[in-house]
Regions:
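Hydrophobic alpha-helical segments with strong N-terminal bias
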Residues: 3, 30-33, 52, 64
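Enriched for short, Lys/Arg-rich terminal
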Residues: 1-5, 9-16, 20-24, 57-64, ...
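Short, well-structured alpha-helical segments
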Residues: 23, 27-31
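A short, surface-exposed loop/turn module that caps and links secondary-structure elements
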Residues: 32-57
Length: 88
């Protein structure tokens, strides 16, 4: 099982997810990626550009869980969990 850490941005997103009623869904995704960050399904995407090296999983139609895996230290860093489209 991998250790999950959160960026400051992702910590802020936790509050938004809770108020939107998405906390349980995110907890399930976090448990899944802690066991195997590359498990498919549910589907994940490799990101490109500024977020190259990160992965994205759908929370719902609007929000994504964006994370990076550091296998050498058994850690996943969650970058964000709120809107992937800039309309926070």
């Amino acid at each position: 099982m991998l250790i999950i850490k959160f960026t400051n941005n992702a910590e802020k997103d936790k509050k938004l997810l809770k108020s939107a009623g998405l906390e349980d869904k995110v907890k399930k995704l976090l448990n899944l990626i802690a066991q195997n960050p590359f498990q498919n399904p549910p589907r994940y995407e490799k990101l490109v550009g500024d977020l190259q090296g990160y992965y994205s999983r759908r929370i719902n139609l609007q929000h994504r869980l964006v994370y990076k895996v550091y296998e050498n230290i058994n850690t996943i860093v969650v970058h964000s969990m709120w809107s992937h489209y800039g309309d926070n």
